[in-house]
Amino acid sequence: CMSKTVSIFNQKGGVGKTTTCVNFAAALGLKGKKTLLVDLDPQGNTTSGVGIDKTEIEKSTYDILINDEPAKDIVIQTQFKNLSLLPANMNLAGAELELAEEENRFKALKKALAPIVMDYDFIIIDCPPSLGLLSLNALTASDTLIVPLQCEYYALEGLSQLLGTVRTVKQHYNEHLELEGVLYTMYDTRLKLNSQVIDEVNQYFPNKAYKTTIPRSVKLAEAPSFGKPIFYYEKYSKP
């Protein structure tokens, strides 16, 4: 059985990255896939999104990156089916500066995950909204990435930068990295602009955009504050 590691990455904040991460991982778990969520965002919203109190966590992804703690000792089983978590807390905010001192600064996460990769069918990484060392570590450790994209005109501004980063990672650190797909989030069917954005994205990423779009949804927006993926919070919420 092959394990697959996927980064959810967009250096723009507020595009539904964490929501995508938590719910994608929860869906895989419900489908019977053993799934590990890796929270690499110092804000720790993925951690709280699966019901873990990030202020109570003694050790986090910071410790596997900087202190060489074994990842298996830090993994938390969530209350959700087949879903485990490597949590984040505020310590992670200092990780970029500390990683900068390391010789293998881009490969710290890959090295930390290596002993446990085969324990999971999927590893899903929530990247911080930046092009810094944490995101580069995520991309170096991943087989593929999914780019959540808000359907608005400004969403396109960061795309060439994002593609440049992916190219750099492929060239120097991880030649196997592939773009899995582009996921449209916060989709409002009433807006004409959405379809313009979609046409333009299709030029950037031919055949990479998912047909499924994630509409704006109150329930989807509420679920994280209850620490639950959408399937456990409001199963019949409009998809």
Predicted regions and their residues:
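P-loop NTP-binding core
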Residues: 1-239
